[in-house]
A protein has these predicted regions:
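Short, ordered coil/turn segments that flank beta-strands lining enzyme active or ligand-binding pockets
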Residues: 97-98, 246, 485
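Short beta-strand scaffold segments in enzyme catalytic cores
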Residues: 92-94, 138-140, 479
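Residue-level preference for non-acidic, small/hydrophobic
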Residues: 100, 119-126, 195, 231, ...
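Small-residue-rich helix-loop
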Residues: 89, 103-105, 367-370, 374-519
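N-terminal glycine-/serine-/threonine-rich phosphate-binding loop
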Residues: 62-73, 98-114
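Conserved serine DD-peptidase/penicillin-binding transpeptidase domain
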Residues: 2-10, 19-83, 129-403
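Short active-site loop at a secondary-structure junction
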Residues: 105-125, 361
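A short, well-structured edge-of-sheet supersecondary motif
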Residues: 81-105, 334
Length: 519
């Protein structure tokens, strides 16, 4: 555990004995299915593309381009220089996927911070390497004996990096609660020995390089800075439910799952009925949540706070579920790295299967889930590490013809400020995936303009667009596909970096650009 805590800081800075004949499999498949989207023709290779019709022009925000003028190019240039967002450093590439023609470009080979547009690269790589039917397995094993109603020995939860295990994003039976109830139904009344978490599918470094500590710690409730782990549960976050008490007293705090983290409550309930300034901070060196500030007398709210040690969080949550099922526990809770002599394989009791990858990448792209993205990134990475995932991503990109010399891949979510991508590389990935064998799953994973419960819910209504958003401080991006009235599908990538004006103006400009592409 000490090693994990040390690595966490480093990463931020730079049944069988009971007579069970087989394994009970829990299918965590959610109820909803993605909306199908029609496929598109393949794009031509880069060597066959026609020259750009974009206007030859330089601007304060755009650099130079040398290409014939076109109405689309003039309109897009106007949008980028009309004073709304001209202080941004802009990158853009727009390509007709039917003809391969470049319709517009601006700094297409310059490197930009992609923010969550990095998830396009991550999910494309995962879909190509793992396939849309890939499913994670999380197993409960037992090595010991059972006398009467008492299990004695080692219970091992063997993780595979499944981000959906107990997740609120893809609703289904809670696997830990189901396991506990099944044990109780089989007559178990007490468990003695060791409860061990095997998280070795991933390495022990929970954070990738380049995350902005100040930024992610101030984004409570947005799944920012969640630790990656080979054994994860409930999105690796604890829900801190806060409600007002009497004036002058600390607010009431309840945790879900209960008993999994400590709370240091230094907040107060004010005498006012409105106006709250409560802050919920995480302490990276331990599973402690710190509350400060004030809450109004009418306040009720929930903040999701990432836990620092997902493995111990999972094990402690299982202990709570066992007790809730009426099973007494006298167990030592251990990370497998703390066990001097690793337990034998024992026998499988239960297995939890994740939904297929096609549904997992839809969570990543439609809801921009950073935790799912990081788990997926390490899943296909060599050695279960961020560095191994970076190398494998680079190999995929080079295989499909992307020039990676100006690309940097340090994480799967795009939270890293050490990620770099060019507009050309992004469009080349989009073009490749538009004719990929898994293109149906690919298109179904992308948010559509105005689609409920996605990052485009309030944007681009009635515009035929499927695209991934991206946002960090001083970064806005949108990349994906637009469909024109004649049915032609256009791939586009728009990046805005280093602006000092209001972010909403940049976002509005990007949306206006996309509408022009779709005309």
């Amino acid at each position: 555990m000490i090693r994990r805590l040390f690595l966490a800081l480093a990463g931020l800075l730079v049944l069988t004995a009971l007579g069970v004949a087989g394994t009970l499999v829990l299918d965590a498949r959610p109820r909803a299915t993605p909306v199908p989207v029609s496929s598109s023709p393949a794009a031509e290779s880069s060597s066959d593309r026609t020259s750009s019709p974009a206007a030859a022009k330089s601007s304060a925000s755009g650099g130079s381009r040398s290409a014939p003028a076109s109405d689309l190019a003039r309109e897009m240039d106007r949008l980028l220089t009309d004073g709304q967002a001209d202080d941004a450093f802009w990158g853009a590439l727009v390509q007709d996927l039917e003809t391969g023609q470049i319709l517009y470009e601006r700094n297409p080979n310059k490197a930009f911070l992609p923010a969550s547009n990095q998830k396009i690269v991550t999910t494309a790589t995962a879909l190509d390497l793992l396939g849309s039917t890939y499913r994670y397995e999380t197993t409960l094993r037992f090595d010991g004996r059972t006398v009467d109603s008492v299990m004695t020995g080692d219970l091992i939860i063997d993780g595979s990096g499944d981000p959906t295990f107990g997740s609120v994003e893809l609703r289904g039976a809670d696997p830990l609660a189901s396991w506990a109830e099944q044990l109780a139904d089989m007559g178990v009344r007490r468990i003695e020995g060791r409860l061990i978490g095997d998280d070795n599918r991933f390495d022990d470094r929970p954070y990738p390089e380049g995350w902005d500590v100040d930024y992610i710690t101030r984004q409570a409730g947005r799944y920012m800075g969640t630790s990656a782990s080979g054994l994860s549960y409930s999105d690796n976050v604890v829900a801190v439910k806060i409600s007002a008490a009497r004036p002058g007293a600390p607010p009431n705090v309840r945790l879900r799952p209960a008993g999994t983290v400590k709370v240091r409550n230094e907040a107060q309930t004010s005498s006012r009925w409105r106006g709250s300034s409560v802050e919920v901070d995480r302490i990276f060196t331990g599973n402690t949540v710190h509350l400060t500030g004030t809450v109004a007398r009418s306040y009720r709210g929930t903040v999701n706070v990432p836990v620092s040690n997902p493995t111990m969080f999972t094990l402690q949550s299982f202990v709570q579920e066992l007790r809730a099922a009426g099973i007494e526990t006298d167990v030592q809770v251990l990370d497998i790295d703390e066990v001097e002599e690793p337990p034998s394989d024992g026998k499988d009791l239960f297995m939890s299967l994740s939904p297929p990858l096609s549904e997992i990448i839809a969570v990543v792209n439609k809801r921009s889930n950073n935790f799912y993205a990081e788990q997926l990134f390490r899943t296909y990475g060599w050695g279960g590490s961020a560095r191994g995932a970076s190398k494998r991503t680079d190999a995929f990109l080079r295989r499909i013809g992307v020039d990676t010399r100006q690309l940097l891949v340090n994480d799967g979510s795009g939270l890293s400020r050490k990620d770099l991508v060019t507009p050309r590389a992004m469009v080349e990935v989009l073009a490749h995936m538009s004719d990929h064998p898994e293109k149906s799953a690919w298109f179904a994973s992308l948010p559509q303009g105005g689609e409920n419960n996605t990052t485009l819910e309030y944007r681009l209504h009635r515009t035929p667009v499927w695209a991934k958003t991206g946002s960090l401080r001083f970064v806005r991006a949108l990349s994906g596909y637009a469909e024109r009235p004649d049915g032609r599908r256009i791939a586009f990538a728009f990046f805005a970096n280093n602006y000092t004006g209001p972010s909403y103006r940049v976002t509005r400009t990007i949306d206006d650009l996309v509408r022009k592409v779709a005309e």
